[in-house]
Regions:
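N-terminal Rossmann-like or analogous alpha/beta NTP/dinucleotide-binding catalytic cores
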Residues: 1-118, 232-233, 237-250, 308-314
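Short, Lys/Arg-enriched charge-dense amphipathic segments
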Residues: 59-69, 89-103, 118-137, 146-149, ...
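Active-site cores that bind ATP or allylic diphosphates and position pyrophosphate for catalysis
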Residues: 105-270, 274-283
Length: 334
């Protein structure tokens, strides 16, 4: 059994807020409760929205709250070779394909088929550019030489999508409406038909940026992440990531999706909903006092008792045992 590894993976689009501190605290406590390591990954693949200043601010905030990673943080923007290799692997087995459809064209195709999405709902790709499934009697492997030398950057305005039906066929599943099932340590038994709910999702965007789903799956495997602890708003990403893990021959971690911090109107607290940066003190003593107060509030969201400690580091140690009792009791059922 591999040693436990957890991670916190913020996007450097701004400072940490109360909601992101809950995610950081939960992942840190879970790693420590399992005697494992805790890593920080800076998810900066959406480069136009990210900044180095925000990255430095995030790391400083984590240090103020005694949430110290066990290795230097890695940046997704430095890992494009890994993502290219994964996409080439999928292409070699005909599990991915190019798509030149714009969002407007996808919406029009859905409307023509009577499947127009509800307002604010995501567009489920109708398969306009999807190639036919390869015959089971013929080779399903593309030319290795052609794939190895292929330059994705030369394909302007072209996205690359996962061929879900081909992924299922490769596993011996002929029915495209196959249900992906998994067990969440908080939410319990979960299931989703990825083909119907998400469709052939994007792996590399038409603007040349790598998609979140591919990057997170590749990085979790490369970093040996065994326990993923994150907010409940990300739970619906899990089945897509499991399908992609299976297509790439990668292990599937354990998942725990934790409660969210919400606004007064019930929306998830985020930068988009006006979340303020974590409050700080004006000197080292007031900084420590404020950090402890921030952690106490985050622990409350996670159902943990108040800590009597007088420092962030001591409070964290007190909460490890409480975390085991609250969040690790269902692991034997997985």
């Amino acid at each position: 059994t591999p040693p436990c590894s957890g991670r916190f993976a913020p996007s450097p689009t701004g400072a940490l807020h109360a909601g992101s501190l809950v995610a950081a605290l939960a992942s840190w406590l879970d790693a420590r409760a399992h005697g494992g390591r805790w890593l920080v990954r800076i998810e900066d693949i959406d480069t136009p929205r990210c900044s180095t200043q925000a990255q430095h601010t995030i790391m400083r905030q984590l240090e103020q709250h005694a949430l110290l990673p066990d290795a230097a943080p890695v940046l997704q923007s430095h890992r494009t070779a890994l993502y290219q290799s994964a996409l080439r692997q999928l292409l070699q087995h005909r599990l991915a394909y190019p798509c030149t459809c714009s969002r407007k064209q996808i919406a029009a195709a859905l409307a023509n088929a009577g499947n127009a999405p509800e307002r604010h709902a995501g567009l489920i790709y109708p398969g306009t550019c999807r190639p036919a499934l390869p015959s089971l009697n013929t080779s399903t492997q593309a030319s290795t030489d052609d794939i190895a030398t292929f330059d994705f950057a030369t394909q302007a305005h072209t996205a690359w999508r996962l061929h879900i039906a081909a992924c299922l066929q490769r596993q011996g599943i002929a029915e495209p409406s196959h249900i992906t099932r998994w067990s969440d340590r908080s939410l319990g038994a979960q299931q989703q038909c990825v083909a119907h709910t998400a469709g052939d999702f994007v792996l590399r965007r038409a603007d040349g940026l790598w998609a979140y789903q591919l990057a997170v799956v590749v990085d979790d495997a490369a970093q040996g992440i065994t326990h993923i602890v994150r907010g409940a708003d990300l739970a619906d990403n899990t089945p897509r990531q499991i399908v992609l893990q299976q297509a790439l021959g990668l292990p599937t971690p354990q998942y725990l999706h934790t409660p969210l911090v919400c606004t007064a109107s019930g929306e998830k607290l985020s930068k988009q909903t006006g979340a303020a940066p974590l409050p700080e003190g004006h000197n080292s003593q007031s900084n420590r006092t404020q950090a402890l107060a921030n952690l106490q509030a985050a622990a409350l969201v996670l159902g943990l008792p108040p800590s009597s400690a007088n420092s962030p580091a001591r409070a964290l140690q007190q909460w490890v045992a409480a975390w085991v009792g609250k969040w690790c009791k269902n692991e034997a059922l997985l």
